[in-house]
Design a protein with these regions (language model features):
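Hydrophobic alpha-helical bundle segments that form small-molecule/ligand-binding pockets
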Residues: 132-138, 144-173
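Hydrophobic alpha-helical connector segments
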Residues: 72, 86-118, 170-177
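N-terminal intrinsically disordered/low-complexity leader segments
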Residues: 1-22
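Amphipathic alpha-helical segments used for helix-helix packing
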Residues: 98-99, 113-135
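Helix-turn-helix
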Residues: 26, 30, 34-68, 72
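Short, basic, alpha-helical segments at the C-terminal edge of helix-turn-helix-like DNA-binding modules
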Residues: 75-81
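Amphipathic C-terminal alpha-helical segment
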Residues: 110-114, 153, 157, 177-194, ...
Length: 209
């Protein structure tokens, strides 16, 4: 005769991996927020743990080192930003150059919302590269290359729509955009003003005429 055990009341037991994943996600979110404001070299693990309210032992369950944590932050920010670019650049109901203007306006509003304290995590790390683990270099370059490719595709749409001349090299324009945009973001943080973003955007669109 088989005996059926009574079903326990309440929620089913959680998988032991779930709390670890929750903690990891919290640490990554906290780290991304901090590193859009401060440099990697100036931020210690203790600051991240204090802000996230996570014990140090839990950090090392999720990441082998601060370097491994840094790689996770770059990957998370790259994924977030790629989705942001796609939201604007793949909006086929909007003319291509207007998509780029919408992205710029959204970024401008984001910087204003945070009092110009936050910038670009990838740009911040790029400026620090001389003091960072060498393993970050290729990852950061790959992120910029991805952003440039998405921007080039939007500019190619603009070219096909006759918004910019056929003689323009869209890949080169996209590279130029990101080199200049990162500088404009840096100046906006420095000046606590959207003026550098506006000056750069105006100059870039003038270049396309």
């Amino acid at each position: 005769m088989t005996t059926t055990l009574p079903r326990r009341r309440g929620r089913p037991p959680r998988n032991s991996a779930e709390p670890r994943q929750d903690t990891r996600a919290l640490l990554v979110r906290t780290g991304v927020a901090v590193l859009t404001e401060k440099g990697y070299s100036s931020v210690g693990i203790d600051e991240i743990l204090r802000l996230a309210q996570v014990p140090k032992g839990s950090f090392y369950h999720c990441f082998e080192s601060k370097e491994a944590f840094g790689h996770a932050l770059i990957a998370a920010y790259a994924d977030y930003f790629a989705r942001k670019l796609d939201r604007w650049f793949l909006d086929t109901a909007t003319p291509p150059l207007q998509r780029l203007r919408h992205f710029i306006a959204d970024a401008r509003q984001g910087m204003q919302r945070h009092g110009f304290a936050r910038g670009c995590l990838v740009g911040n790390l790029g400026q620090e590269m001389g003091a960072l683990p060498e393993s970050f270099r290729a990852q950061l370059e790959a992120v910029f290359a991805d952003w440039q490719a998405r921007t080039a595709a939007c500019l190619q749409d603009a070219q096909r729509a006759g918004e910019i001349g056929a003689g323009h090299d869209c890949a080169a324009l996209a590279q130029f955009f990101w080199i200049g945009w990162e500088g404009a973001v840096l100046r906006a943080k420095l000046q606590h003003s959207a003026a550098p973003l506006d000056v750069y955007a105006q100059g870039f669109f003038q270049l396309l005429k």
